Curated annotation (Swiss-Prot):
Its main location: mitochondrion. GO terms for cellular component: mitochondrial inner membrane; mitochondrial large ribosomal subunit; mitochondrial small ribosomal subunit; plasma membrane. This is Large ribosomal subunit protein mL42. It holds the Pfam family MRP-S32. It comes from Bos taurus. The gene is MRPL42. Belongs to the mitochondrion-specific ribosomal protein mL42 family.
């Protein structure tokens, strides 16, 4: 198995040397396309292949091609007045309405007072009168 892998590596290296001839210098660019390409012919890039001088690395250069303005299309913008589709605001409003229906505080406070054997007043928030009288910066202990 290992012998077959070594033979394949050697044969692929010699094959690459024949496909991409190396001249003096570190890199030689080949101007022709390879016979096999997974990209369609009208794809917007020019592919150039190169092989380094030590024949260990294949370099692929594919800059994107500029597309003429005549071949582009504008982004469709729907009319906001006559658009019947759901907008982001409508979706948020419906979600908030659904959440507010589930948050009823009446039975929740009664259930809490029965569970912990307390009065209902314990579970309501403290009023502004009590919050105002609380010291904001209590003195530190010595």
């Amino acid at each position: 198995m290992a012998l077959a892998a070594v033979k394949w590596a050697i044969s692929s290296r010699t094959m690459l040397k024949h496909l991409f001839p190396v001249e003096n210098g570190a890199l030689y660019c080949v101007g022709h396309k390879s016979t096999y390409s997974s990209l369609p012919d009208d794809y917007n890039c020019k592919v150039e292949l190169a092989l380094t001088s030590d024949a260990r690395t294949i370099v692929c250069y594919h800059p994107s091609v500029d597309i003429p303005y005549e071949h582009t299309k504008p982004i469709p913008r729907p009319d906001p007045v006559h658009n019947n589709e759901e907008t982001h605001d409508l979706v948020l409003k419906t979600r908030l309405e659904e959440k507010s229906e589930h948050l009823e505080q009446g039975p929740m406070i009664e259930q809490l007072s029965k569970m912990f054997f307390t009065t209902k007043h314990r579970w309501y928030p403290r009023g502004q009168y009590h919050r105002r009288r609380r010291k904001l910066n209590p003195p530190k202990d010595r």
